[in-house]
């Protein structure tokens, strides 16, 4: 029996990564922390779903930018060695016109840098991130710039990146 991978799920939504990983093997994957916050909502429905479905996880319902580095240090001390997340896609999505596309500079696109901040502090062995395929081409005025910036940010931290299309 191998070591359990301890997980921090960022931009957790209703827990898709948690369900997928734990369904594949509860002996291998254990989520310790999750973060879900909906800034424009009076109610935090996705967060409430997480509390109900996953009562043994520490749920953090605040803007990820407001999570102090000390919390990430705690996660590191508690053995978190994997970060997963589907960071907000609105600034890349086809639901937004290409003319109004802001990509990594948009209100939600900048949240990518919070993944980098958490990674810098926690230093996980692995990261699994997902986003819409339009991210690869954003912004339309400089196709692929944002994805290249993201790859460079992970490279600077010593991570190699694998890009896989979903099926």
Residue ranges of each PLM-predicted region?
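Conserved active-site and SAM-binding loop architecture
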Residues: 1-167
């Amino acid at each position: 029996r191998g070591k359990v991978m301890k997980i921090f799920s960022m931009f957790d939504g209703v827990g898709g990564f948690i369900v997928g990983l734990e369904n594949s093997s509860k002996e291998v994957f254990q989520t310790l922390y999750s973060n879900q916050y909906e800034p424009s909502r009076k109610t935090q429905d996705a967060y409430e779903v997480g509390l109900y479905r996953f009562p043994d996880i520490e749920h953090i319902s605040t803007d990820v930018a407001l999570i102090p580095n000390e919390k990430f240090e705690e996660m590191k001390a508690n053995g978190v060695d994997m970060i997963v997340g589907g960071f907000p896609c609105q600034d890349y999505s086809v639901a937004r016109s290409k003319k109004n596309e802001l990509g990594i500079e948009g209100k939600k696109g900048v949240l990518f840098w919070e993944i980098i901040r958490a990674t810098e502090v926690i230093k996980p062995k692995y990261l699994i991130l997902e986003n819409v395929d339009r991210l690869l081409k954003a912004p339309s005025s400089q196709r692929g710039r944002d994805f290249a910036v993201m790859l460079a940010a992970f490279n600077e931290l010593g991570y190699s990146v694998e890009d896989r299309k979903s099926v």
